[in-house]
């Protein structure tokens, strides 16, 4: 499988698929899958292309990934051209090499090879591929999941090929993620001259005690799977830029990464209580990016642990840290979900790269997961 994985990865990297422009990546994948009998369904939404490819019937094991990449930044800082896909000393360089065209290629080749060997396999193998993960993530996996739910089509197990490894390939499997919710808070005051404060009402001064309470509040203590919920102020703005004008409004944007000990409703209620307690005039808009999810040790987690250990000779650690991913959408279907892929040390950076031996092992691991899960059905 190694040569096929590397060749496909290079072909994908050579297509400059800056989110959400797929640039023909999914068509390349679709042709391979169709050649071995996969049924293809194109699910475009807005400016996003999505592919749902399936083979077989029964319990569904899905591989999920994205063809889109982040912008390259300053091209002159790259040692090798970002869309050239050059291999130097066993490292494949290019935007998307690690996040996540390499793992995507490994998934495709693993599924293709499995179907060639076992065309009448048990269950259903699926690939869910989107071009909208790195940017808005509004017309990609979330829309495909909504479509599948509407027609009662189920995903039982899902492996997302995000680059989960931290310091050594295979050291981490993600079996959950924290939730993410953002508050956009507008606190009203009365604008005026700084020399006449009695004729104005400074929203910055009024909000200080509230902000102190908000940033020091302990939401929970976490649990055995998640660290404690954390809140960070991301942006804050008030005033006109002049030193003699009391601002009429204060804008505060804050984000919480929250564990399973709280819910988004608990968070909203508590923040509202604080605002009312401090008698502020305000408007708050909430944006829920994703709810927390956890896949406990069971068939998928155990199969992934076994496969990674077999091909890396290390025992991976189960982890729920980091940001959000498309796994959060798939988890809403009741699926067991894990994320596993190459090292994440160079993702989104200049000179993004991946070890080609790691990609080959990725393919072997994904193949072994298929074998293990189908044998247990």
UniProtKB/Swiss-Prot annotation:
Role noted for this protein: Catalyzes the hydrolysis of N-succinyl-L,L-diaminopimelic acid (SDAP), forming succinate and LL-2,6-diaminopimelate (DAP), an intermediate involved in the bacterial biosynthesis of lysine and meso-diaminopimelic acid, an essential component of bacterial cell walls.
Naturally occurring in which organism (per UniProt): Histophilus somni (strain 129Pt)
Lineage per the UniProt record: Bacteria, Pseudomonadati, Pseudomonadota, Gammaproteobacteria, Pasteurellales
Keyword field contains Metal-binding: yes
UniProt catalytic activity: N-succinyl-(2S,6S)-2,6-diaminopimelate + H2O = (2S,6S)-2,6-diaminopimelate + succinate
Residues forming the catalytic site: 68, 133
Protein name stated in the entry: Succinyl-diaminopimelate desuccinylase
HAMAP family, per the entry: DapE
An example Gene Ontology molecular-function term: cobalt ion binding
């Amino acid at each position: 499988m190694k040569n096929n994985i590397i060749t496909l990865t290079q072909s994908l990297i050579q297509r400059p698929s800056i989110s959400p422009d797929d640039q023909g990546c999914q068509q390349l994948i679709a042709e391979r899958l169709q050649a071995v009998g996969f049924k293809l369904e194109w699910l475009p939404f807005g400016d996003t292309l999505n592919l749902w490819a399936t083979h077989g019937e029964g319990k569904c094991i899905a591989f999920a990934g994205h063809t889109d990449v982040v912008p390259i930044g300053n091209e002159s800082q790259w040692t090798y051209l970002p869309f050239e896909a050059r291999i130097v000393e066993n490292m494949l360089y290019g935007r998307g090499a690690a996040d996540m065209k390499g793992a995507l290629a490994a998934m495709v080749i693993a599924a293709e090879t499995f179907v060639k060997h076992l065309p009448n396999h048990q269950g259903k193998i699926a690939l869910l591929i989107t071009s909208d993960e790195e940017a808005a993530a509004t017309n990609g996996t979330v829309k495909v999941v909504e479509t599948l739910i509407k027609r009662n089509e189920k995903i039982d197990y899902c492996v997302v090929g995000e680059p989960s490894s931290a310091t050594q390939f295979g050291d981490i499997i993600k079996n959950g993620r924290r939730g993410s919710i953002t508050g956009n808070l507008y606190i009203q005051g009365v604008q005026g001259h700084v020399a006449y404060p009695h004729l104005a009402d400074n929203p910055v001064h009024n909000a200080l005690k509230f902000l102190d309470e908000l940033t020091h509040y302990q939401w929970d203590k976490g649990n055995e799977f998640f660290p404690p919920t954390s809140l960070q102020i991301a942006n804050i703005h008030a005033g006109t830029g002049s030193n003699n004008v009391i601002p009429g409004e204060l804008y505060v944007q804050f984000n919480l990464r929250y564990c399973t000990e709280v819910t988004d409703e608990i968070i909203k209620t508590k923040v509202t209580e604080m605002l009312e307690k401090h008698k502020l005039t305000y408007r708050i808009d909430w944006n829920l990016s994703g709810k927390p999810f956890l896949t406990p040790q069971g068939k998928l987690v155990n199969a992934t642990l076994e496969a990674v250990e077999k091909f890396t000779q290390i025992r991976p650690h189960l982890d729920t840290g980091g940001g959000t991913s498309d796994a959060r959408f798939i988890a809403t279907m009741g699926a067991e979900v894990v994320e596993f892929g190459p090292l994440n040390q160079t993702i989104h950076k200049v000179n993004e790269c991946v070890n080609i031996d790691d990609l080959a092992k990725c393919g072997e691991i994904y193949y072994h997961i298929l074998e293990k899960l189908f044998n247990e059905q």
